[in-house]
């Protein structure tokens, strides 16, 4: 049996109209650094005192079926915005010549997505489709000499059995955002022109939780359960003025 190394693994993501209903059109293709998306079926031991001659409790029943995980991606000019929109809530895009400006704003109703996860190319039937995927947290960082990356924690409704492999057609202009591509600009009274930054890390916690209810092994639609939090840390060079 072949070993699944994960080479050439990637994602295809589409925004859903209705939570948990699969959409496979207008997909964004995203390269991966790592991914732990999976579905797990809990098995709970029955607690009654009826036991076989071994004296062990041998019976179990199905508990919750949980889908989700984390993924780490390189931030690129093309494709990464779909996940950022799912994390923040809303996005507007305007074109100016050959360039595009994307503005992401927080929204209470977070969009969900259908994620098709191709688990490498050295095994057959390695594509798994997750529905009802929502971003519970996001962390984005970049340091001098490196490339910008982001990690996302995903809560999903369910996934289908793995099926036929799919191929990637990454768009042109999807180069990785390297440290020399631009500056970090912050609003407010802080004068960023006087600061030389070595690195930054931006973290968003959407306070999403699974909603386990009677009548289903799957979560209901996760909703924001507390005040969302955004934190940012920067490392800068200091000098006397």
Role assignments for model-derived ranges:
Residues 1-241:
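Signature of extracytoplasmic/envelope-associated structural regions
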């Amino acid at each position: 049996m072949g070993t699944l190394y994960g080479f050439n693994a990637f994602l295809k993501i589409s925004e859903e109209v209705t939570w948990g209903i699969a959409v496979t059109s207008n997909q964004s293709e995203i390269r991966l650094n790592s991914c732990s998306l999976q579905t797990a079926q809990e098995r709970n031991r029955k607690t009654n005192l009826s036991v076989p001659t071994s004296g062990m409790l041998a019976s179990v029943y199905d508990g919750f079926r949980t889908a989700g995980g984390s993924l780490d991606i390189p931030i690129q000019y093309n494709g990464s915005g779909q996940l950022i929109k799912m994390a923040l809530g809303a996005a507007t895009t305007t074109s100016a010549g050959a360039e595009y400006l994307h503005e992401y704003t927080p929204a209470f109703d977070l969009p969900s997505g259908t994620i098709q996860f191709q688990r490498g190319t050295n095994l057959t039937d390695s594509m798994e489709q997750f529905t009802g995927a929502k971003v519970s947290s996001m962390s984005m960082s970049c340091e001098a000499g490196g490339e910008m990356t982001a990690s996302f924690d995903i809560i999903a409704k369910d996934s289908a059995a793995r099926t036929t492999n799919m191929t990637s057609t990454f768009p042109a202009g999807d180069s990785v955002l390297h440290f020399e591509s631009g500056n970090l600009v912050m609003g407010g009274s802080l004068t960023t022109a006087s600061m030389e930054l070595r690195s930054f890390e931006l973290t968003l916690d959407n306070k999403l939780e699974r909603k386990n209810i009677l009548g289903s092994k799957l979560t209901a639609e996760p909703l924001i359960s507390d005040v969302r939090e955004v934190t940012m840390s920067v490392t800068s060079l200091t000098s006397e003025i």
